[in-house]
C-alpha cells in the first residue's frame, strides 16, 4: 500500500502557491470578417490605435489605418494566403519600426528591413520608427554645403546642396535612374552614406543597379531598399519610409546622407490601391485626399539640422515619372511644390543624343549658388543664361536664311556648350574637371574645333591636367577658389593641348 507523506504534499502545495502569478493579461483581440486583395476587415479590436500593428493567428502582420464604427480595416504586410474568415487577430500595442545599425551598409533589404540578398541576418540593437516626425523650423539651418553629383549640367547650373530636396522628373526611359545612380557613384570618398529606395520596379532593373554599385565599389557606403513590382501594395507604400528611417539614423549621428526614392509615382499608385480597397473616398485622378501628405511628410524629413543637432544632413532626390511630358498632373505638381527645385529630363533631348537629357531652361534649384563652391560660381555663373539665349536663337534661326557673323558665332558657341554638357553614363566628373570643361567652353577655346571633336579634346585636356599639372587640382580642392594662379595654369594647358590636338587631327 502506498503511504501518503503529509510533509511532501504540503511542500508541493507551498511550491505551487509560490509560483502562482496573479498578473492579469488583457489581450485586445478581434475576428476576421473578410480577407482578400491585401486587405482584411476585422470585427472587435476595440482598443486598437490608428496605424498600430496587428498580428494574425498564422503569423502575418498588418497595419490598421482604417478605424470604422463597426469594424477595422487592416492592410497586410504579406500575401495573407493562410488567413481564414473567423480566425483571431490580436493588437500588438506597437507601431511600425525597424532595426537600424551600421551593419546595413552594403546590403539589399526589403521594406521591413529584412535582408533579401542571401547574405545572412543583419545584427542591430537599436530601433527607429518608420514614421518619425520631421525636424522643426528651429532645428534646421539653411543649406550651404554642395553635394556634387558629378554631372556638369547639374553642378554648374542646377546645384544641389546637402539637406536639399531636388526632384528628378521626366517621362519613362529618359535617364532619371541614371542621374540618381551617377550621383551615388560620385559620393565615393566623400563620406556620404547613400540609400537607394526602389519602389515597384522590375527585379531585373534593381539587380542591374546593384551590380553597377558593386562593380564601382559604391555598395560600401550604400543601402538598397527594394520592393519590386510583385510586392504587396502595403510594402511598396512603406519602402520610402523605411529608407528615410535608415538615412535619419545616420543623419542624427552627424553623418551626411543621400536618399533616392525611385520612384514616388509608383508609391502613390500603391497607396491609391490600398485606399480604394479600404473604401476611402477617391479624389482627383482617383487618388485619396491625403496623397499630398503622403509625400510631404516623407520629403520634409530631409534636412540640414542646426549645429546643436550635429553637422549631419539628409539630401533627398525623389524621382517622379510623367506621362508624355505632362508636369501639370496631380502627383508631379504635388512633389514640385514640396521640393526645393526640379531637374527636368526631356524625351526629345534624350532622343536627340543629348545625355543626360536635362532641360536646363525649365530645371531650377531653389537653393542656387549657396550650394556651389566659389570656383564653380566664378566659372559657371553665366552659362545658364548663355544656354537659354542659345536655345532661343536656335529656334529663331530655323526660319532665318542669312544670319550675320555675330549670330553665327553665338550659335557655334552655344552648340559647343551643349556638347560639353554631354556625359556617358556612370562616368561622373570631379569638381576640378568640371571647372576645366566649363572654362574651356565659355571662354571660346572650343570655337576652333569641330563639334564632333569637342568631347575627344576635353578628355585629352583633363587627362593631361591630372597627370602633368596636379597643382591645379590641389589649388581648387584646398582653396575652393578659381585663383589667378589656377587660371594661368589652365590657360597654358589649354593652349598647349589645343595646338597639339589640331596637329594630331591633321595627320
UniProtKB/Swiss-Prot annotation:
It is a peripheral membrane protein. Its EC number is 7.1.2.2. It comes from the Eukaryota. The record marks 363 as: Required for activity. Pfam families: ATP-synt_ab (PF00006), ATP-synt_ab_C (PF00306), ATP-synt_ab_N (PF02874). Its main location: plastid. Coiled coil: none annotated. It is found in: Plastid, Chloroplast thylakoid membrane. Keywords: ATP synthesis, ATP-binding, CF(1), Chloroplast, Hydrogen ion transport, Ion transport, Membrane, Nucleotide-binding, Plastid, Thylakoid, Translocase, Transport. CDD domains: ATP-synt_F1_alpha_C, ATP-synt_F1_alpha_N, F1-ATPase_alpha_CD. InterPro entries: ATP_synth_asu-like_sf, ATP_synth_asu_C, ATP_synth_asu_C_sf, ATP_synth_F1_a_nt-bd_dom, ATP_synth_F1_asu, ATPase_a/bsu_AS, ATPase_F1/V1/A1_a/bsu_N, ATPase_F1/V1/A1_a/bsu_N_sf. ATP binds at residues 170-177. One of its GO terms (molecular function) is ADP binding. Produces ATP from ADP in the presence of a proton gradient across the membrane. The alpha chain is a regulatory subunit. F-type ATPases have 2 components, CF(1) - the catalytic core - and CF(0) - the membrane proton channel. CF(1) has five subunits: alpha(3), beta(3), gamma(1), delta(1), epsilon(1). CF(0) has four main subunits: a, b, b' and c. This is ATP synthase subunit alpha, chloroplastic. It comes from Nuphar advena.
Amino acid at each position: 500500500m502506498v503511504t501518503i507523506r503529509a510533509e511532501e504534499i504540503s511542500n508541493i502545495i507551498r511550491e505551487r502557491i509560490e509560483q502562482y502569478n496573479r498578473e492579469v493579461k488583457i489581450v485586445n483581440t478581434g475576428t476576421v470578417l473578410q480577407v482578400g486583395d491585401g486587405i482584411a476587415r476585422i470585427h472587435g479590436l476595440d482598443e486598437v490605435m490608428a496605424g498600430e500593428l496587428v498580428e494574425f493567428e498564422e503569423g502575418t502582420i498588418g497595419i490598421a489605418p482604417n478605424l470604422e464604427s463597426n469594424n477595422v480595416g487592416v492592410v497586410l504586410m504579406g500575401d495573407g494566403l493562410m488567413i481564414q474568415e473567423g480566425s483571431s487577430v490580436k493588437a500588438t500595442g506597437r507601431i511600425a519600426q525597424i532595426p537600424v545599425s551600421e551593419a546595413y551598409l552594403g546590403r539589399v533589404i526589403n521594406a521591413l528591413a529584412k535582408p533579401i540578398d542571401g547574405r545572412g541576418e543583419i545584427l542591430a540593437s537599436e530601433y527607429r520608427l518608420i514614421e518619425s516626425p520631421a525636424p522643426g523650423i528651429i532645428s534646421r539651418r539653411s543649406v550651404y554645403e554642395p553635394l556634387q553629383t558629378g554631372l556638369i549640367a547639374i553642378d554648374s547650373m542646377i546645384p544641389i546642396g546637402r539637406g536639399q530636396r531636388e526632384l528628378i522628373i521626366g517621362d519613362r526611359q529618359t535617364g532619371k535612374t541614371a542621374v540618381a545612380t551617377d550621383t551615388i557613384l560620385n559620393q565615393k570618398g566623400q563620406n556620404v552614406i547613400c540609400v537607394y529606395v526602389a519602389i515597384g520596379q522590375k527585379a531585373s532593373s534593381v539587380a542591374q543597379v546593384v551590380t553597377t554599385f558593386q562593380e564601382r565599389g559604391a555598395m560600401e557606403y550604400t543601402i538598397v531598399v527594394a520592393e519590386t513590382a510583385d510586392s504587396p501594395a502595403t510594402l511598396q507604400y512603406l519602402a520610402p519610409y523605411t529608407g528615410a528611417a535608415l538615412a535619419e539614423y545616420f543623419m542624427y549621428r552627424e553623418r551626411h546622407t543621400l536618399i533616392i526614392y525611385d520612384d514616388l509615382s509608383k508609391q502613390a499608385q500603391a497607396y491609391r490601391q490600398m485606399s480604394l480597397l479600404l473604401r476611402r473616398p477617391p479624389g482627383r485622378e482617383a487618388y485619396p485626399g491625403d496623397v499630398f501628405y503622403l509625400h510631404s511628410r516623407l520629403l520634409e524629413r530631409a534636412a540640414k539640422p542646426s549645429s546643436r543637432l550635429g553637422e549631419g544632413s539628409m539630401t533627398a532626390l525623389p524621382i517622379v515619372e510623367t506621362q508624355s511630358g505632362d508636369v501639370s498632373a496631380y502627383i508631379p505638381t504635388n512633389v514640385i511644390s514640396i521640393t526645393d527645385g526640379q531637374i527636368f529630363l526631356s524625351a526629345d533631348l534624350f532622343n536627340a543624343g543629348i545625355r543626360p537629357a536635362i532641360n536646363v531652361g525649365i530645371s531650377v534649384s531653389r537653393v542656387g549658388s549657396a550650394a556651389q563652391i566659389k570656383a564653380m560660381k566664378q566659372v559657371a555663373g553665366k552659362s545658364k543664361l548663355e544656354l537659354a539665349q542659345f536655345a532661343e536663337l536656335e529656334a529663331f534661326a530655323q526660319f532665318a536664311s542669312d544670319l550675320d557673323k555675330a549670330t553665327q558665332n553665338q550659335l557655334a558657341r552655344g552648340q559647343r556648350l551643349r556638347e560639353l554638357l554631354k556625359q556617358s553614363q556612370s562616368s561622373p566628373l570631379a569638381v576640378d574637371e568640371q571647372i576645366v570643361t566649363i572654362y574651356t567652353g565659355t571662354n571660346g577655346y572650343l570655337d576652333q574645333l569641330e563639334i564632333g571633336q569637342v568631347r575627344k579634346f576635353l578628355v585629352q585636356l583633363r587627362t593631361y591636367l591630372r597627370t602633368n599639372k596636379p597643382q591645379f587640382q590641389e589649388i581648387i580642392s584646398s582653396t575652393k577658389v578659381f585663383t589667378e594662379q589656377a587660371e594661368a595654369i589652365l590657360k597654358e594647358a589649354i593652349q598647349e593641348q589645343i595646338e597639339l590636338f589640331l596637329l594630331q587631327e591633321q595627320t
